[in-house]
């Protein structure tokens, strides 16, 4: 980390510039001066080598090299700096995986079986055109008793059959091996009966079709290979080491005269070509003992087709052997043999795996050792991996031979790193869930990267599963991320999580610089287990990292050297919720109800167990903050809602408030044990930040839930996060402290003794949500809030809670250009509607950044980037306007970010895959930068497209002018709808049937009658015919009046009024 972290250019970093001879010259200069140089002498020495730095660059370089914080540079310090720089430039040094290879839980697919499973295989789907689909097919399990079961892809039963000897119907079989033949729709079984039984599996039928009998010895291992443009081959090995290959030609038909549908063919007939559909190639006795495994391999070198076979030494044979015999052989398929390689292993080989890309051959046997072979030098294994305590029965390779998985007889799996030749993981859960004393079989599914292990039950577990990049970008940690910090000295990001990992990131190129695993540990029930990291901070020079854990332990880390310098304990099993490094003091607090002070360095610590400050909280301390102005002040808040201001210089409290009633001041207790001055504890149980069930936050449909005023007053509130504004002076008329309540409100305080509560505003727009973390920039212009539902909001606070004479005019058009959220919407979203009635602050941005709780926010002023961490195990990068850059630790890389400027306008921004489908239109608008490419409108003339800005502009001017809708040249004629299909409702009023209430003494009839307006009749001098038409209209009006009904049932008030 040392070299890449300096502010100098890459060509001026020491480890990249100096040569080996120049390092020797530096060593001679240090040796001549007692192995140490002053900082000025070191600068002159580097200048002689051609390395020149400015004052700021050299000051940063000295802080990185000089870990002793003195005026001298030791040779050991410079050498450590160079070594760390070389390690950081190694591309393989930071590829350490956070998750172990087998990290998930075991998934039980089959419960306890009647017959123990000895073989698991997968039969893919083969279509009529010869194409193969590995995503469709059947799982097949076999028992020693010959019970064969077919299962669907999700392990639902499909077919159950039994294999019995073809000639001895009443005798029991003992199955040795099975193999499916997918292209022939057949299944091959071999047992102790010295015969090959081939069953036809079509349409849920399991029928015996072919029996190859009279084999010299029982077949113990089989392998099958098929393809569209090649014949199907079955490779077999027997108890004496003979290897034979059967080639199937289904296009060759044979007519049989017998009545039986089963064809019986002897091995000699197949060898002599008497049965045309099957040919046999006999390779002879290539191995001395029982063949345990055979496998076809791809072309190696100039040889097109090969196979590998291995044999285990028979312990029952007591014959003396003068010279070692081969236990594994690589042989060509063609005869005479073009290539034959023999490997001699003591006690034989039971299993092997081969990787054609790098020609890596791995073997395991009863001697419990894994051997890695170079096939071009078979005399001696290149590497021997020792670690198993029983015979190895199964192994496979992953990621082009980078990892080896091996399973032994005790059902313990070990994962090995081939490159570094070290053990990565020992997984022993199979030994606890499977019955003891019964061998287990295994099958590795390359497509799903899953391992199937079966005995009396069947379990499936994932082995380094691949990330589905269409649904997620991956993860940064293996458990929720709790702390996110930015180191200005090294210009790196540091994240800590509940997995007890400390990871240093180069966020510009998405690279892990340092990984510290098991940073905090404890021994429980005799087992060393990691402890969750809950708080962290840097020292003033940002050279040291202080972390606090859930068990109450504190550790000081050297970021440059990646070592733990000191370990402190505030209290046993006491979660640390806040740590601060002030000058030479360390302040820690948590669930111990008080602040504990330590000396930063052990030689200066007069109180090894810490100096406890006066107790002012009646419950656990949830959050704390330290002001950046003078005089130094620290604010702490407990679960009961007690907010206490402390003077850092003296450690004395000077103000105490209640978050539920912010305008009332609580008395300060100056004696221990004054329970009458303490606030009563909350009755609701306390939970950690990430322990809220997801179902409790999922079903949120309302904008806001309003509680009754009485319950609102009785409810005790606690502050979830505190934030000081460092640029604001300590004055009574200025809001300098923000605190987020658990009901979604944000309170504003002044930490001046004459200040107090200044106001509050609503910071959420979803019911039940709350603000978990707060952050701001150096100039205190913006306030960033992160909520429990994953939303990130940006507020403009520069002009809020300050005196009127200091307020100024805000350039809102410039902010609208910077934040796409401020663009007009046809229908305002919930975020805008919730903040519409608030006078201050101004909501600039709101979008969903995570699917889970946001636990930390950090803003980088130089580059304008906002980093967020969440309980969904991710750390994400955003621009100030809300554009998504990437996820730290993701396999999806992004363009390298500039060092000191924001990303350019033409930067390739993306949308998180997990947020593409289920987000609001407001979040989607922010993620797209105000451009909606999926919703485009055709223009009238040119046939072009109109963007969202054009649509919004048209919607804004809709009140001024509404254009006429163009039709086919003439207005539509009545009726517009086809009345024969859809009958229009009657235009007369629909009157309900009224049921009179007989409890009243009188009925208010006329009060509830609907009266139609009566139009006066006009008397004119018309003809008799015209007068007759008027009288007809009058009669129709009278008929409608007679059909009148009551409108509504009478009420009590109406009845009293009538009386």
From Swiss-Prot:
It comes from the Eukaryota. WD repeats lie at residues 121-161, 170-209, 214-256, 344-383, 387-426, 476-515, 528-567, 616-658, 714-759, 766-805, 849-888. It holds the Pfam family WD40. Keywords: Repeat, WD repeat. This is WD repeat-containing protein on Y chromosome. It comes from Anopheles gambiae.
